[in-house]
Amino acid sequence: MSASPQSRPTTIACLLGPTASGKTAAALALAARRPIEIVSIDSALVYRDMDIGTAKPTRDERARVPHHLIDIIDPADAYSAAEFRADALRLIGEIAARGRTPLLAGGTMLYYKALTQGLNDLPTADPAVRAELDADAARDGWPALHARLAQVDPATAARLAPNDSQRIQRALEVFLLSGQPMSVLLAAPRRADDEAAAYRFVPVALEPSDRAVLHARIAQRFDAMLDAGFIDEVERLRRREDLHPDLPSMRCVGYRQAWEFLDGDTDYRTMRDKGIFATRQLCKRQITWLRALPERIVVDCVAPDATARALDTLERVLDDHLPA
C-alpha cells in the first residue's frame, strides 16, 4: 500500500474517540460491509490478561474481524509510542498486501500523534539508569526526585505531580542519557520518514454534542465491568509478584482504583466513584486532543444514529469522496 514520492498518498481511515463513544460498534458495522482489519490505537489493549477493565473487544467481536495490537505484551512490560508507530506502519502494509483495508481505531492520542506527526529524538529506555532512579526513589521518595528534576528541567517538573513516578523517572532518564531537558527535546522539530509520508491519515472523530450523555454511559460501563468480575481480574494480577501499582499497565484507568480498594485504602463505593471520575477525566483529555485536530471529521457519538453516521463517513473516506 506504500506510494512512491510522486504518487498520491494512500488514504487511511482513522476512527478516533474517547472511551464509551461507540468506536467498536462503528468498526464492526464497517467490517460487515468491507474486508477490513482493525489496528488498535489503544495503550491499554496491548496488555494480556487485562480484559474487563480495558473493555477489550470480545472473542466474538474479534472472530468477526481481525484485530491487531491487542494482547501483545505482558502487564509487567512497557510499550512505547515509537514501538506503536513501527508496528502500525508495518501492519498497514501487511494488511494491504492481503488485499484487505486497514482501519485504525482507538483513543490513545499520543500514539496517533506519533504515527501521523513523527517522533522526537528522545533516547530509548535504559534499564540501568531506571534501576538507579528506582533505588534513589526507594531511599529518598519520589518527591525528592521531583525536586531534582525541577533543578534540571523546571518546565517538565512544573507539569508533573511530585508522586508521578513514571513520568518523573522518564524525564530524569532523558536528561541523564542526553544531557538535555526533556522539554527542550520535545519542542524540537519531529522526525518524520518516507514510510509514513506514503499515507494520508484521515481522522473521523466521535465527539459528544452532550457530554452528560457520554458521562452516563461511562458510569454504566464501569458498573457493568464491576458486575463482570473486574475486581477478581485485578486480584489475579495483584497476586503476581512482578506487578505493582506504579507500572504503566496498573496505572490504566480503573486498575489503580481497584488496586487501592484491594489494598484496603478505600471502600467499594469510593473505589467505584473514583474509577468513574478517573474515566471521565480521561474522556475529557481525549476530547481536548481530538479538538486540536483541525482536519478531523466530526461525528456526534451521542446521536441516535451515531453508528450509521460513522459508517457513512468512514465509507466516504475510504472511497476518497472527501477533499484532499
UniProtKB/Swiss-Prot annotation:
GO terms for molecular function: ATP binding; tRNA dimethylallyltransferase activity. Its EC number is 2.5.1.75. ATP binds at G17, P18, T19, A20, S21, G22, K23, T24. It comes from the Bacteria. One of its GO terms (biological process) is tRNA modification. InterPro entries: Dimethylallyltransferase, IPT, P-loop_NTPase. Gene3D superfamilies: 1.10.20.140, P-loop containing nucleotide triphosphate hydrolases (3.40.50.300). The keyword Magnesium applies. Catalyzes the transfer of a dimethylallyl group onto the adenine at position 37 in tRNAs that read codons beginning with uridine, leading to the formation of N6-(dimethylallyl)adenosine (i(6)A). Belongs to the IPP transferase family. This is tRNA dimethylallyltransferase. The lineage of its organism: Bacteria, Pseudomonadati, Pseudomonadota, Betaproteobacteria, Burkholderiales.
